[in-house]
Amino acid sequence: DTGYDGAGATVAIIDTGIDGAHAGLDDLDDDDATYDPKVIGFYDPVNNPSLTNGTEVFPYDDQGHGSHCAGTTAGTGAPTYEHIGMAPQANLVGVKVLDAGGSGSFATVMAGMQWTVDNRYQFNIRAASMSLGGPGAIEWTSSEEASVNRYGNAMVLAGHPLFILAAIY
């Protein structure tokens, strides 16, 4: 235990969304008498690409993986407190780049990365997590690979530790 609980920081989860009503992700102190939402922003280029200010869509996850990642990162552990995230006092921003089937396009992933960089000050985003993968090797064009490198570098240069896991299953 390092004593760090994530207080004052926000982590962007770039994935299938975040269930804003989940008991371990709905508020910072798990006290229904206080209004202190844990998920403070949400962008959905999959189903709501024109709603870009981060507060127009209630956070949702129609697949589940993004909520799992959010819980591992910053879940409070409610209701049983058996499994608490690494930074339970951190806020979250959900960036939904994958659909209900867990699939997505290069365009929505790039839109999500760009939105995260563009909104880093508004939401105090200090780190970003992308845990994306698929059934085979990713075959990008050279321009797509250059875009991933450019946006990844932009995120790191903007001060975001970027955790990317690309799994092949």
Predicted segments with their positions:
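Subtilisin-like serine protease catalytic core
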Residues: 1-43, 47-107, 121-127
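Substrate-binding/access-modulating region of protease and related hydrolase catalytic domains
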Residues: 5-7, 76-80, 94-169
